């Protein structure tokens, strides 16, 4: 079973991937949508910030956060610097919260029934990790289609 430090490492890696996507988008494409595509990359980034702060930061970590889910999908032209600052804060917050979860707490029920069935904290964090990567993949694909550029290179480790 995954521990808090293992979850923290995974979220750290993939929140860095999300920030790299933001850096790779030019301003003209960040809020652009294509036919048949509902959300821009900018809106997906706002959504991931709100989702992870609400479910991991607030519900698991007890860190105050007032989510405005409607704004996550309706806001346009949020300054890049604001999104970058939100993602940088998220990249600090989420691993800290996850690393602090006690082994017994992973088996407790997540405090909110979001998916229609009670889930343990562990199960719900696994769901959130999949959700993060689903949207990071969408963002990457949008960037490639809109810019004509290929995959981002992996950072040196």
What spans do the regions from the language model cover?
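Short, contiguous alpha-helical
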Residues: 4, 8-12, 16-19, 28-71, ...
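Acidic/histidine-rich alpha-helical segments that form the ligand environment
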Residues: 75-112, 120-132
